[in-house]
């Protein structure tokens, strides 16, 4: 059971500690960006439109595949998107954001999702601007009962499927039947 957070998050900026923190609310990002940099609201709309398109493409063709059939990447939707995807795979997130926004606070907000990928905006491909679709357009959600409740729910599902869960033991091997590990 997910609950939308409002605000999704609150940002404190180094060097601006005497100013109130910035609340990032779903559906209000354009207004926030415009208040910090004239013209940034319109540019954010274009940025989020792109993020939404890339997110949809990734969700439909990359996120839920095991890549056993490379031909799946030759889907017409993916092929049509190649001219836009190429630069997003080759360019970095930081430069992608910097080309659109000047205010360092806006750059920090848009670069922050790289943290969830275990990297920095310098290393993350620009394609990962799709993450901004999730926090700025879809909204930040939190599982009722915390993330432990999510783990408990997943454990229940796999137990019902016949999986035996053992904790506090050392794993010495992974056995996979009828297919490679």
Tell what function each PLM region has.
Residues 6, 23, 169:
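Residues at the C-termini of beta-strands that transition into short coil/loop
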Residues 98, 129-181:
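Helical element adjacent to the flavin cofactor pocket in flavoenzyme catalytic cores
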Residues 14-123:
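Rossmann-like flavin
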Residues 1, 38-41, 139, 168:
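Glycine-centered secondary-structure boundary/capping sites
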Residues 10-12:
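Residue-level detector of beta-strand face positions
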């Amino acid at each position: 059971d997910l609950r939308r957070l409002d605000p999704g998050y609150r940002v404190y900026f180094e060097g601006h500690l005497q100013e109130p923190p910035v609340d990032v609310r779903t559906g209000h990002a354009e207004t926030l960006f415009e208040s910090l940099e004239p013209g940034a609201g319109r540019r954010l709309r274009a940025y989020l439109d792109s993020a939404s398109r890339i997110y949809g493409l990734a969700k439909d063709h990359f996120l839920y595949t095991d890549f056993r059939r490379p031909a799946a990447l030759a889907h017409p939707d993916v092929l049509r998107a190649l001219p836009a995807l190429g630069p997003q795979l080759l360019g970095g997130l930081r430069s992608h954001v910097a080309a659109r926004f000047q205010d360092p606070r806006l750059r920090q907000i848009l670069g922050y999702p790289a943290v969830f990928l275990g990297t920095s905006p310098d290393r993350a491909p620009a394609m990962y601007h799709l993450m901004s679709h999730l926090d700025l357009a879809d909204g930040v959600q939190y599982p009722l009962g915390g993330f432990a409740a999510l783990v408990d729910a997943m454990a229940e599902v796999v137990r019902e499927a016949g999986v035996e869960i053992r904790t506090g033991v050392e794993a010495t091997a992974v056995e996979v039947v009828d297919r490679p590990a």
